[in-house]
Amino acid sequence: NFFLGRYEAPLPTSPRCNARCLGCLSLQKTGEISHSQDRIAFKPTPKEITQVALFHIERVKQSVVSFGQGCEGDPLLAADVIEPAIKEIRSKTRRGTININTNGSRPGILAALFDAGLDSVRISLNSSRKPCYDAYFRPKGYAFDDVIKSIETAGIKKKFVSVNYLNCPGFTDTPEEFDALSELMRAYPVNMIQWRNLNFDPKRYWKIMSAVSRPGNPMGMHRIISRIKESFPDVKHGYFNPPKEKF
């Protein structure tokens, strides 16, 4: 999209991550499965980030620029370059939407980025239940409560919140998962759900989830999505980060 001059441009920044997701796209240490793309090996400077972002914003109508890509770790670990970059971008233009895709592990840092001019956040979850989240994300140095706090922080700052909901039929569409997601959405500000197909062996995933929970009988993804839409009619559904003109 960046080279084609349209939609959402990536701003990869972080070589490090504080989660060890089983299906990580950019790092697989065991060799048991391969990663689909190499992780960025350096941290760009605020100036470099700003130049790329402004180039895209200035030539694309309703543009989006996003930190947190499949080819990097988590961008909250690179806030030392992201925060000044956001400030510099916003000193030059109010156009464009600045978004961050993240695991939401550091709510305090996320709050500082919002104050700098960040417009929206997409936070990844495979489950709204802590044992199931921990079994897949395998967090290092943060807890599930930090992720929830980040969602809450975005709401307090009145920023647009998307959940990057990693779903796998047979688990995601169980009554337990539906109830947990519904409870999360009633308690915290979620503006959009991005229903993301989980890039992981579904049989292996089910076994891992079954070891930490007792999944009930699946209801079907279509029914789950329909029930969420009925219960939360104001929540948007999609697959991509929207520009602020469509919040």
Give the predicted meaning of each segment.
Residues 2-29, 64-67:
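N-terminal pre-triad scaffold of radical SAM enzymes
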Residues 70-72, 103-105, 126-128, 166-168, ...:
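Active-site beta-loop-alpha junctions enriched in small/polar residues
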Residues 108-115, 170-187:
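Catalytic cores of alpha/beta
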Residues 138-140, 150-177:
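Conserved strand-turn element in the central/C-terminal portion of the radical SAM core barrel
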Residues 57, 90, 114, 155, ...:
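N-terminal cationic-hydrophobic initiation segments that often serve targeting/anchoring roles
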Residues 8, 28-109, 115-147, 191-194:
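Core AdoMet radical
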Residues 79-95, 144-159, 214-237:
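Alpha-helix-loop-beta-strand connector modules within alpha/beta enzyme cores
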Residues 1, 179-247:
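Auxiliary Fe-S-binding modules of radical SAM enzymes
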